[in-house]
């Protein structure tokens, strides 16, 4: 698989129970690299190395290969989320020490969880993402009508050129044969090989 010991994502997920009943869970991985996170901390790893300190392994709470903000702790409806977050965050430091991890990183958490993190004297690292937002456009024409005439004309010209001699077929469910999956994997791996000399994050499995 793509997320396992063999790919450097060793599962260490946390489950909280009350009287034998699960009430909360948090994804957690012990990692020996920084790939697949879309948060680039290689400069931190280099700084650790230059000072003779081990940066890996590290603990990471994240949805692998998904740079999207969202919940990172699943909590039962009847349970106080603030209490659960405090319990998990208080114990994460001891778990990092137990497993020999240099640090714990929670990637793209929801904003409410950030307040709990700050209360535990943990550091915040701010990144920047650029998002396109739909300002009540009903279709693509509505969107490009907001462009200046010259830019709109150039965009339409570029779109026409990009689709010349190209046929697009949409496949769903059982229409996607093993051969198509094999082709998709080969294209995926070739793209990464051209980009950075690796095979990418996802495996055939």
Locate predicted features.
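A conserved beta-strand-loop-helix scaffold within acyl/acetyltransferase catalytic domains
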Residues: 1-55, 93-205
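A gly/proline- and charged-residue-enriched helix-loop-helix capping module
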Residues: 41-86
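Long, well-ordered alpha-helical scaffolding segments within enzyme catalytic domains
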Residues: 87-92
């Amino acid at each position: 698989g793509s997320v396992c010991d063999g790919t450097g994502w060793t599962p260490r997920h946390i489950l909280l129970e009350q009287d034998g009943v699960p009430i909360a869970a948090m994804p957690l991985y012990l990692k020996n690299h920084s790939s697949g996170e879309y948060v680039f901390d290689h400069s931190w790893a280099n700084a650790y190395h230059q000072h003779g300190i081990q940066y890996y392994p590290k603990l990471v709470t994240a949805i692998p290969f998904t740079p999207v903000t969202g919940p990172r702790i699943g909590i039962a409806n009847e349970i106080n989320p603030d209490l659960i977050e405090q319990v998990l965050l208080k114990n994460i430091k001891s778990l990092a020490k137990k497993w020999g991890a240099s640090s714990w990183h929670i990637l793209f958490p929801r904003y409410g969880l950030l307040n709990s993190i700050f209360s535990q004297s943990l550091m915040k690292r701010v990144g920047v993402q650029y998002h396109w937002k739909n300002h009540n456009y009903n279709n693509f024409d509505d969107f490009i009508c907001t462009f200046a005439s010259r830019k709109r004309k150039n965009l339409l010209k570029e779109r026409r050129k990009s689709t010349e001699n190209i046929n697009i077929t949409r496949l769903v469910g059982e229409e996607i044969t093993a051969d198509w999956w094999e082709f998709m994997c080969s294209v995926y791996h070739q793209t990464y090989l051209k980009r950075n000399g690796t095979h990418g994050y996802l495996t055939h499995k």
